[in-house]
Amino acid sequence: MRPMHGTTVLCVRREGRVVIAGDGQVTLDKTVMKATARKVRRLGEGQVVAGFAGATADAFQLFELFEKKLKEHARSLPRAAVELAKQWRTDRMLRRLEALLLVADREHLLVLSGAGDVIEPDPVANGAAAAIGSGGPYALAAARALLAHSALDARQVAEEAMKLAAEICIYTNGNLTIEEL
């Protein structure tokens, strides 16, 4: 069985609010297997939001490891992210995991990969945004434009950007799960 793939997860920060949104579509090859998957969640006693793109089982394992790193490092998101990225890159079993994580608290927004990357995107006018997954580039472009040229709040920006991504990316649907800080 080939791994399931295709998703869009977008995180937007504006005026002290942080919103992460994930679509619900899970695709196996050319078939939609599920339309209501939950790809975003809260971690760190509710102070961190996180989403994943990639193999579902791998993502759940990474969520568990990241939760442990948050506890070990007193909920310091950057420190926990760097420690997870180091472990992910150097551990023989973890290196095989196929996923990307998007994590955020009120101050930081980070993308983590198995290559050891911990990327904090550049801020954009009136906020910050990052996206992962097959529809990520579409959602990110829309979010940046909305942040720069509208007065929409963080949730509205995320919803509109995800709507546009779902219209363009065949691996993304409009069944959103949204978490806010």
Curated annotation (Swiss-Prot):
Binding site for Na(+): A166, C169, T172
Pfam families: Proteasome (PF00227)
Compartments (UniProt record): Cytoplasm
GO biological process, one term: proteolysis involved in protein catabolic process
Active site: T7
Molecular functions per Gene Ontology: metal ion binding; threonine-type endopeptidase activity
Main location as per UniProt: cytoplasm
Cystine pairs: none
UniProt EC number: 3.4.25.2
Domain of life: Bacteria
One cellular component (GO) term of this entry: HslUV protease complex
Record keywords: Allosteric enzyme, Cytoplasm, Hydrolase, Metal-binding, Protease, Sodium, Threonine protease
PROSITE patterns (UniProt xref): PROTEASOME_BETA_2 (PS51476)
Function, as annotated: Protease subunit of a proteasome-like degradation complex believed to be a general protein degrading machinery.
Family in the record: Belongs to the peptidase T1B family. HslV subfamily.
Subunit organization: A double ring-shaped homohexamer of HslV is capped on each side by a ring-shaped HslU homohexamer. The assembly of the HslU/HslV complex is dependent on binding of ATP.
Protein name: ATP-dependent protease subunit HslV
Organism expressing this protein natively: Anaeromyxobacter sp. (strain K)
Gene that produces this protein: hslV
